[in-house]
């Protein structure tokens, strides 16, 4: 039996995908190198053991504090180290955040993520964010935050406020990491993930492809994530968006669409119970490419015209694509509620 074929087949026992935490780079590479039909077939087969293959999760992302970040992430328009078009703002007002969350829910989002461009939150700001989290939770939405590094005590406060998920990406492989970030170590990120876990928060953690890394780096990132003590509940995969004024522009190049789909498929096989999210960069993807990603196991998208400081497909376009594919999402629930306003208010 071909070893690469055996790797994924051994991940499914009695119809259930069993997560592993001891992946080797060679195994990830063997999966990636499979003939495309075999790779996508295996990914879809494993996907079906844990998820409804015809359902896509929809989430919304809001920058509640933009720009002026002390970190030097070489891809980020919000870093204070670079001259970009992004202007630094203060933390948004509570009522504005809640109103945005309400509109996101009415548009079809089931989860609302609040992002702040900080190295780490100050206590006075964290208190305000905890109130925002509680208010968004009262709307009946799942809550997520990405605020930079956290202490265990800060994670505990967010969890007590009702936060469900904490996002803190590893961005890339351990080998490539130092080429794009110098002000925050990869270990800093791992420790923040541990603090979130210890507090009872679910973890959202992924990275970016197209920063100038090699395929081995992309697979190295997936191996890093898959070998964590617990797999992230959500794995966002971002495709590089060109940003004016950042140093990564010198080496960045969006991956070939087939290469990106292969990345999604390997992520699905290696982390069979994690939600795999198509994140930034979808505005550059054709409908056909997104459909292939979903066939390969991607089952979540961010909706809304803007993701932090970058563009995103219009919500109406996303709804139309999922309808064409015959896939379900919260868009269907919203449409039903609008068609039956009396009954939906009574629920």
UniProtKB/Swiss-Prot annotation:
Annotated InterPro entries: Aldolase_TIM, BATS_dom, Biotin_synth/BioAB, Biotin_synthase, Elp3/MiaA/NifB-like_rSAM, rSAM
Residues that bind [4Fe-4S] cluster: 69, 73, 76
Classification via HAMAP family: BioB
Protein name per the record: Biotin synthase
Role, per record: Catalyzes the conversion of dethiobiotin (DTB) to biotin by the insertion of a sulfur atom into dethiobiotin via a radical-based mechanism.
Pathway: Cofactor biosynthesis; biotin biosynthesis; biotin from 7,8-diaminononanoate: step 2/2
Cofactor comment text: Binds 1 [4Fe-4S] cluster. The cluster is coordinated with 3 cysteines and an exchangeable S-adenosyl-L-methionine. Binds 1 [2Fe-2S] cluster. The cluster is coordinated with 3 cysteines and 1 arginine.
Keyword terms, alphabetized: 2Fe-2S, 4Fe-4S, Biotin biosynthesis, Iron, Iron-sulfur, Metal-binding, S-adenosyl-L-methionine, Transferase
GO molecular function terms listed in the Swiss-Prot or TrEMBL record: 2 iron, 2 sulfur cluster binding; 4 iron, 4 sulfur cluster binding; biotin synthase activity; iron ion binding
UniProt xrefs under Pfam families: BATS, Radical_SAM
Keyword S-adenosyl-L-methionine found: yes
Cofactor: [4Fe-4S] cluster; [2Fe-2S] cluster
Taxonomic superkingdom: Bacteria
Assigned EC number: 2.8.1.6
Keyword Metal-binding: yes
Binding positions ([2Fe-2S] cluster): 113, 144, 204, 277
Ranges where the Radical SAM core domain occurs: 54-273
Catalytic reactions on record: (4R,5S)-dethiobiotin + (sulfur carrier)-SH + 2 reduced [2Fe-2S]-[ferredoxin] + 2 S-adenosyl-L-methionine = (sulfur carrier)-H + biotin + 2 5'-deoxyadenosine + 2 L-methionine + 2 oxidized [2Fe-2S]-[ferredoxin]
Family affiliation: Belongs to the radical SAM superfamily. Biotin synthase family.
One of the GO BP terms on file: biotin biosynthetic process
Top-level enzyme category: transferase
Assembly information from the UniProt record: Homodimer.
């Amino acid at each position: 039996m071909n070893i690469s074929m055996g790797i994924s087949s051994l991940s499914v026992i009695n119809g259930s995908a069993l997560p592993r935490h001891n992946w080797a780079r060679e195994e990830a590479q063997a999966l990636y190198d499979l003939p495309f039909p075999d790779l996508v077939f295996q990914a879809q087969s494993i996907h079906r053991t844990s998820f409804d293959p015809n359902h896509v999760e929809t989430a919304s992302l809001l920058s509640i504090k933009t720009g002026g970040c002390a970190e030097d992430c070489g891809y980020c328009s919000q870093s204070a180290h670079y001259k970009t078009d992004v202007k630094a703002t203060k933390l948004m007002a509570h009522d504005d955040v809640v109103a945005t969350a309400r509109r996101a829910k009415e548009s079809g989002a089931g989860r609302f993520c609040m992002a702040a461009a900080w190295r780490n939150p100050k206590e006075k700001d964290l208190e305000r964010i905890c109130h925002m989290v509680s208010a968004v939770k009262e709307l009946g939405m799942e809550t997520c935050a990405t605020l930079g590094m956290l202490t265990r005590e800060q994670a505990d406060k967010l969890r007590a406020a009702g936060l469900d998920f904490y996002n803190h990406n590893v961005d890339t492989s351990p080998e490539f990491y130092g080429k794009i970030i110098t002000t925050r170590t990869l270990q800093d990120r791992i420790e923040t993930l541990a603090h979130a876990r210890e507090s009872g928060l679910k973890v959202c953690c992924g990275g970016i492809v197209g920063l100038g890394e090699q395929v081995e780096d992309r697979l190295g990132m997936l191996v890093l994530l898959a070998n964590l003590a617990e797999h992230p509940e959500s794995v966002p995969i971002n495709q590089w968006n060109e940003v004016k004024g950042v140093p990564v522009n010198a080496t960045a190049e969006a991956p070939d669409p087939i290469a990106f789909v292969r990345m999604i498929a390997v992520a699905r096989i290696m982390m069979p119970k994690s939600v795999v999210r198509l994140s930034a960069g979808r505005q550059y993807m054709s409908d056909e490419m997104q459909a292939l990603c979903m066939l390969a196991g991607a089952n979540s998208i961010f909706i809304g015209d803007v993701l932090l400081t970058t563009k995103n497909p219009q919500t109406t376009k996303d709804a139309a694509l999922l309808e064409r594919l015959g896939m379900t999402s919260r868009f269907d629930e919203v449409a039903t509620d609008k068609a039956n306003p009396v009954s939906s208010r009574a629920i």
